[in-house]
């Protein structure tokens, strides 16, 4: 039987990334740029979300060679993505020794009915969520870290803003509920009752919740921190920009000093062009990655 890590240990690893930026990278060179810029971790994958979106087809776990090259190149934690419900991809990444697995809607889901039972793994997991129902279901399955789904690969922050605001509003609503109301809310959200009780008692989610999906500028990163994010994932925004090293450093600084508007103004000067963005309303239903999972 596989050894499993305790929730406290897994969640503690996520807490250590709090306030930081996690960057998508596709090779060792990009990983080094991210580390030098101050990233707290990197996400190793074959293609950034913008390229996955452009290429279409089936997106799978990265070649293990890429993951190992990134792991050997940097001293910061390395994450990697597995398809939703793909037990073997997750086990392979665990065997490779990654620090975290992202059960990710950016990749093509392997199972449209079941997410991974993350409690059975030693390695901790991060999962996306759009609302408190999705957040608590992922936590109940064993996720040690959450992130907004946003709309990956678009360079458009609007969906990440929507998801962060919704989760936070629903947490505030739960905190003000009686136990009787909590049971009904658990039914309405499809959320485990005991988890809602814990959220009511603590006044917050039991795991960290990062912003992800559409972060393209230092101002975007600062905005998400102001809305209550515990940190920021940047997928396509850095290495699809004109000056990745400068963009990476600027986003890290803006995430740390998210209320220092003069600094953010300076960081935003002469960065070059940000990644080309996509208007969400122009996406076809099958192109909306955030709809994947349940």
UniProtKB/Swiss-Prot annotation:
Keyword Lyase attributed: yes
Pfam families named in the record: SOR_SNZ
HAMAP family reported for this sequence: PdxS (MF_01824)
Protein name from the UniProt record: Pyridoxal 5'-phosphate synthase subunit PdxS
Residue sites binding D-ribose 5-phosphate per the record: 24, 153, 214, 235-236
Gene Ontology MF: a single term: pyridoxal 5'-phosphate synthase (glutamine hydrolysing) activity
Active-site residues annotated for this sequence: 81
UniProt KW keywords: Lyase, Pyridoxal phosphate, Schiff base
Pathway noted in the entry: Cofactor biosynthesis; pyridoxal 5'-phosphate biosynthesis
Family, as annotated: Belongs to the PdxS/SNZ family.
Gene3D superfamilies attached to this UniProt entry: Aldolase class I (3.20.20.70)
Binding residues annotated for D-glyceraldehyde 3-phosphate, in chain numbering: 165
Enzyme class: lyase
Quaternary structure (record): In the presence of PdxT, forms a dodecamer of heterodimers.
Protein's job: Catalyzes the formation of pyridoxal 5'-phosphate from ribose 5-phosphate (RBP), glyceraldehyde 3-phosphate (G3P) and ammonia. The ammonia is provided by the PdxT subunit. Can also use ribulose 5-phosphate and dihydroxyacetone phosphate as substrates, resulting from enzyme-catalyzed isomerization of RBP and G3P, respectively.
EC numbers: 4.3.3.6
Name of the gene this protein is made from: pdxS
GO biological process: amino acid metabolic process; pyridoxal phosphate biosynthetic process; pyridoxine biosynthetic process
Reactions mediated catalytically: aldehydo-D-ribose 5-phosphate + D-glyceraldehyde 3-phosphate + L-glutamine = pyridoxal 5'-phosphate + L-glutamate + phosphate + 3 H2O + H(+)
